[in-house]
Amino acid sequence: MTNEIDDNTNDVILGFFDGDEYIGGADIEPIRYGEKLLDELNDSIDDFDGRALRRYKLDGGAYLQDIWVERKHRGNGYFSEMLKMTMDFINEIISDGSSVVLRAYSENSNITDDKLAEIYSRYGFVEIQDTDDDGIIMVK
């Protein structure tokens, strides 16, 4: 599997391919200002509480907004490989100890938010807040 970067956005969009076949992607938002991210999360998540995230170095970090696998490729083991490649990419661009924030949230009925959080925890993410309807906020 390979990835390509879309330079036409402020976010980093990784596209994953198996040969010429598009498998899915990842959306990574650089965190220039931690307070801006906290405001953004507060606006989009009803019961978000940013106090715990304030303990982490957010400025200069990254917000992993989404990793997705195209519907026809789900269940073929691509997600784990895409997550590993995404984390390798993030680790290359963040070397100053800044944090990576994500939301373990699934719209796929075959994988729960808790299962996603379990997978992310294998990569060093810790749970900060389990929201009612908007997934689990995690940080590394």
Give short role names for the model-derived ranges.
Residues M1-D7:
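Conserved N-terminal entry element of GNAT/NAT acetyltransferase domains
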Residues N10-I13, D132-I137:
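Short hydrophobic/aromatic beta-strand or adjacent loop that forms the aromatic wall/cage
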Residues G15-F17:
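Core beta-strand residues in small-molecule sensory/regulatory alpha/beta domains
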Residues G19-D66:
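Conserved acyl-donor/pantetheine-binding loop and adjacent beta-alpha core of acyl/acetyltransferases
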Residues D27-I28, D66-W68, R103-E107, D113:
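Short loop/turn segments at strand-loop or loop-helix junctions that form parts
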Residues G61, I90-I111:
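Conserved GNAT acetyl-CoA-binding A-motif
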Residues V69, G75-I90:
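Conserved acetyl-CoA-binding loop-helix of GNAT-fold acetyltransferases
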Residues S106-D130:
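Conserved active-site alpha-helix within GNAT-family acetyltransferase domains
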